[in-house]
């Protein structure tokens, strides 16, 4: 083979550096495997770059240094608002400050409290209606459903649903009826409905398993929507979470000895479905007060039909799990087995109402610590036998009750959450009664 040594670029020629020790201009179209890291200086002409906004192209800024119009359909991890056809839920659990747009209503929300399971979404601009957790305390009305007018109880049952306003001292009004006259029922509350369940009706100890509901925002009769796990009554110990009603401690069956039970059961307050078992109390019991926080139910002051008849423990159980209740603390007194009262709840304390011959006690205990209750005042009338308990944002209420035959009461008492002291009589029920289901809205 002949090798031509020359500074002329051509086929079969050996390249000789020019007078500046540089390779003369040559065609590099066949060069391969050339690393881009070898280029450290100089510029690349725009014409040599395959630019555009389609697949495989290099994106080039326009004359105003802006990215040209292109599709962002496949972009990920880009911060921005959530767009949905519905409002955010309290268990969305975003980061604080997250923005949510309801593209159906046009409402815009910002998460201002990211507490897990209890988010608060604040409506912006001209929009109305924040999204926030439901709280047990009502702001409008207290309800009393059913009850008995006198002894013997079983021939004097009521089906009346009474309602009284928290904002005034007016008497209650009749707003509807239960599907059947009954007493010794349990009351529960939700954002839209109040509930009455269990108890017994005319004709002896005819225990029921009905769960009835009635609308908070209207005046209408109750409807039978579901069943408890078994027939039961003699419980005023109802508690309510944002989604469920809880019933703790009852007497069972339609035949003696009507034993107290340890069962805690729950039913949905947002859909119509039968109750399910939710665990056990620490101590089997019936009668007593029911109290609620956002996360736990409490029972206070109980009765038994065997020694010891008088039980002063406060029990606590979790809404989120079906573990056995804890013996949390004690009330100031252990009263007779027919002293059961409906309880009240502020956001920080439970209020238990106790009565009997010569006894009229209001106990207060903290939800946050295992501290025994303190006696903070008296009811306006000493009474017992299953009064209705209610809670507003500022007051607890105790209504109805019994002081011995034939003295069934119609009194509605109010107890301040802000200042310890005696209850004030603020109105009357439409019918004097005892052992009714209390609720609030």
Q: How would you name each of these model-derived features?
A:
Residues 2-7, 46-57, 76-103, 124-130:
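Extracellular/surface-exposed low-complexity repeats and stalk/linker segments enriched in Gly/Pro
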Residues 1, 19-30, 63-74, 98-129:
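Short, surface-exposed terminal/edge motifs of secreted or surface/virion proteins that either
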Residues 159-167, 209-217, 262-270, 312-320, ...:
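Beta-propeller blade signature
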Residues 14-16, 40, 58-60:
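Small-residue hinge/turn detector
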Residues 139, 155-160, 172, 182, ...:
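A detector of repeated loop/turn-to-beta-strand junctions in beta-rich toroidal repeat architectures
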Residues 138-155, 166, 190-205, 216, ...:
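Glycine-centered tight turns/hairpins at beta-strand boundaries that repeat
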Residues 172-177, 221-227, 274-280, 323-332, ...:
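A short beta-strand motif characteristic of beta-propeller blades
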Residues 133, 140-143, 183-187, 234-238, ...:
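Beta-propeller and closely related beta-sheet repeat lectin domains
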